[in-house]
From Swiss-Prot:
Family of this protein: Belongs to the PsaI family.
Topological relation to the membrane, as annotated: Single-pass membrane protein
Protein name: Photosystem I reaction center subunit VIII
Listed transmembrane segments: 8-28
Gene Ontology terms describing biological process: photosynthesis
Primary location group: plastid
Annotated signal peptide: none
Keyword Transmembrane helix: yes
Top-level division of the source organism's lineage: Eukaryota
Gene: psaI
Lineage, top ranks: Eukaryota, Viridiplantae, Streptophyta, Embryophyta, Tracheophyta
Record's keyword terms, sorted: Chloroplast, Membrane, Photosynthesis, Photosystem I, Plastid, Thylakoid, Transmembrane, Transmembrane helix
Length: 40
């Protein structure tokens, strides 16, 4: 049986920052789209 820390370390160390960056990027893109639509 594999030990859990060796499974969770890459998951938290790689997947969580990737999800955080992706959600932040989408949030900023949405705000930019809405702001440009309001100006036009």
């Amino acid at each position: 049986m594999i030990n859990l820390p060796s499974l969770f370390v890459p998951l938290v160390g790689l997947l969580f920052p990737a999800v955080a960056m992706a959600s932040l990027f989408l949030h900023v893109e949405k705000r930019l789209l809405f702001s440009t639509k309001k100006i036009n």
